């Protein structure tokens, strides 16, 4: 495999698996995580056989009572856990003390964030991370191709 072979195979994202999301002033393009799992499975085989991940989890307690969960995710490939890449961290707020609210899915979401970051460094969905799928221009281009992937 040449240096760019994997990257070139996995860098393009099917627009039907992305969406624009926003949290306050922060806006970005989100990729469906199940689509990402399918994409890496297409390249390396079934999870647990051709590829997989290891993760660590840490809970960080802040002075104001908030708690964050951080997961470090490493990907291994070729059924050889010695061929490992990472860790890449994902972080989510687990407990919001001000609202007295627990985010039960935060640990899972932190792992998903770490997995997405790890995959991005291998070239998966590079078009998203390079900003090629952001904003109205992309949506208009896709509509012009007969695809109604607009946001």
What are these regions (language model features)?
Residues 2-5, 137-151:
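Interfaces that engage single-stranded nucleic acids at replication/repair/recombination sites
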């Amino acid at each position: 495999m040449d240096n760019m072979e994997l990257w070139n195979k996995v860098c393009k994202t099917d627009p039907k698996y992305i969406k624009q999301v926003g949290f306050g002033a922060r806006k970005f393009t989100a990729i469906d995580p199940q689509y990402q799992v399918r994409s890496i499975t297409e390249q390396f085989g079934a999870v647990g056989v051709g590829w997989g991940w290891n993760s660590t989890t840490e809970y960080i307690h802040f002075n104001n009572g908030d708690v964050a969960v951080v997961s470090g995710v490493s990907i291994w490939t070729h059924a050889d856990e010695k061929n490992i890449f990472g860790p890449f961290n994902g972080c989510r707020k687990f407990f919001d003390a001000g609202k007295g609210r627990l985010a039960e899915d935060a640990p899972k979401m932190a792992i998903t964030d770490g997995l997405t970051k790890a995959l991005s460094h291998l070239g998966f969905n590079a078009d998203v991370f390079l900003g090629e799928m952001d904003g109205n221009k992309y949506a208009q281009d896709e509509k012009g191709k007969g695809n109604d992937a607009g946001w």
